[in-house]
Amino acid sequence: MVNAIEMAIDERGGKAGNVNIEYESQDSATAQAGQWDEAKCAENAQTAAQDEEIVGWIGPFNSGCAVVEIPILNEAGLGMISPANTYIGLTKPGGEPDEPEKYYPTGERNYTRVIVADDEQGQAGALLMEEKGVESVYILDDKETYGKGLADQVQQSADELGIQVIGREGVDTTAANFRSVMNKIAQEDPDAIYFGGIIENNAAQLVKDKLGAGMSNDDILFIGPDGIFLDEFLSQGGEAAEGAYITFGGLPESELSSKGKQFVQEYESRYDDEVQPYTAYAYEAANVMLDAIERASKDGEVTRETVLKEIFATEDYNGLLGTWSFDEDGDTTLTELSVQQVENGEFEYQRTIDAGEM
């Protein structure tokens, strides 16, 4: 995502209008945690809040990190645009009690996202099950904000579609393996297993132990969310990942607009690297932020307050993802999600689901 953000800035000559732009990336992960770290997220947000020269925040990547950062940056009046957060409770009811209000201590919104939220991804996951003839499902999650929240949405949508949820539990992601869990599930003989979580929490080991328990993806589907829509799932999962279905709260590179396809070509030429699912979304978020800064500069002084106002004023934005706006909650008006399946060690696009029509 960092490359995509830097590319957006470089293409404008390091400026937003007549304003010189400086960008500094902040890693929310630590070597000790091996993934995003709550204390590091808080530290990053506090550092930004105290630096008056910072007028905008692109991120974070993980929804759990957003839970920590939003209140800190809200009190600082710093506008946020996330390329990747999908947890429903960050912007609207449907998650835990007092959400989303508890993330906005000032009573004013400062957070936006350019990707579809998990209430719609949960519906897409359940709809996929229905289309595949699934009558029963066992739902697992990694006990984190994103994973548990998404699993909750899938369970709710499955219930509404008449799909029997025969088991639901959070797994110990620090365990060396999940053999006991998978052996137990095998006795229940569901039509599908759904996992709400991220690749860093041993999603690949789950599919390995699923196969080891005699549950092939031909007989018992494995369905996961965009938290495992990463190359690591393919490389770590190997043969066990074959046939797995993945939902994504957006569109893969092959289904982007003509602008999106042009971006992919230019990005891969520039960095000699393939785009990842969130690369285009990071580029979109960066350009929206730069546009907000430019509009603020034309109206007067560029401050956190004026940039935040212009972020929320984003309307009919014609970008890589199509034409869209931010609603009053900070959510994108985009409604398209996608389904991928692992085939021959690659994610292969299957279809687009329009949440607005579900």
Predicted regions and their residues:
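Surface-exposed patches in mature extracellular/periplasmic domains of secreted proteins
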Residues: 17-25, 56-61, 138-142, 196, ...
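Segments of small-molecule ligand-sensing domains
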Residues: 269-279, 290-347
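Extracellular/periplasmic periplasmic-binding protein-like sensory domains
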Residues: 207-283, 297, 347-349, 353-358
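Signal peptide-proximal N-terminal region
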Residues: 2-28, 159-163
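Hydrophobic alpha-helical
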Residues: 63-74, 176, 190-214
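Short beta->alpha junction loops
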Residues: 25-38, 44, 116, 167-177
